Amino acid sequence: MALLPDKEKLLRNFLRCANWEEKYLYIIELGQRLTELRDEDRSPQNSIQGCQSQVWIVMRQNAHGIIELQGDSDAAIVKGLIAVVFILYDQMTPQDIVSFDVRPWFEKMALTQHLTPSRSQGLEAMIRAIRAKAAALS
């Protein structure tokens, strides 16, 4: 995730955007920075149900117990939202992910009130899936 900013820089960059068009473009740019997902990882077990777009999220635990996330979507804005979620969960253990509430970060960014209801539901589905996978590993 070296190409993605940390949580604090994400928030600073997001708040520097002059309007929501710039914020959407920034989210899309973050999605473009994600590591390419391998074709074999675009499988049903990595598919996230509850998203209008196709979304795949792969979770692996490294030798130090830290979760590594990879993901992709067929929609640019959704891929950017995946990147935002990954930034928030960066360098966490499964236990950290289960106990960490991303919603205050979304509130600071005023993110959810500017998403369509289906995108908000998809974002919630991604978070639920990541937390469930983390709970299974903890």
Curated annotation (Swiss-Prot):
Keywords: Cytoplasm. SUPFAM superfamilies: SufE/NifU (SSF82649). One of its GO terms (cellular component) is cytoplasm. The keyword Cytoplasm applies. Pfam families: SufE. The active site is at C51 (cysteine persulfide intermediate). Belongs to the SufE family. This is Cysteine desulfuration protein SufE.
